[in-house]
Amino acid sequence: MANTSKVVKAARGHKFAVQNYSRCSRCGRARGYYRFFGMCRICIREMAHKGELPGVKKSSW
C-alpha cells in the first residue's frame, strides 16, 4: 500500500519542475533509475537475465 501511494504521488506534477522525480515503471523504485529504459537497475538486471531485453547481454572482460 505504501509503495502504491508513492507511485501515485510521483505521477502528480509538482509546482516546480525540479521537484519532479522519476520512478521505475515496474516496481516504483526511485533510486537507481535509468531514463533510457524507464526502469531501475534491479528490474533491468532481472529482465536482462531472463532475456527480455533485446540486445542486452552480460559483459565480461
From Swiss-Prot:
Cofactor note: Binds 1 zinc ion per subunit.
GO BP term (any one): translation
Example of a GO MF term: rRNA binding
GO cellular component: cytoplasm; small ribosomal subunit
Cofactor entry: Zn(2+)
Keywords: Metal-binding, Ribonucleoprotein, Ribosomal protein, RNA-binding, rRNA-binding, Zinc
Binding-site positions, Zn(2+): C24, C27, C40, C43
NCBIfam families found in the cross-reference section: PRK08061.1
HAMAP family to which the protein is assigned, alphabetical: Ribosomal_uS14_2_B (MF_01364_B)
Function: Binds 16S rRNA, required for the assembly of 30S particles and may also be responsible for determining the conformation of the 16S rRNA at the A site.
Family statement: Belongs to the universal ribosomal protein uS14 family. Zinc-binding uS14 subfamily.
Self-association and partners: Part of the 30S ribosomal subunit. Contacts proteins S3 and S10.
PANTHER family (alphabetical): 30S RIBOSOMAL PROTEIN S14, SMALL RIBOSOMAL SUBUNIT PROTEIN US14M
Official protein name in the record: Small ribosomal subunit protein uS14
Species for this entry: Deinococcus deserti (strain DSM 17065 / CIP 109153 / LMG 22923 / VCD115)
Organism placement in taxonomy: Bacteria, Thermotogati, Deinococcota, Deinococci, Deinococcales
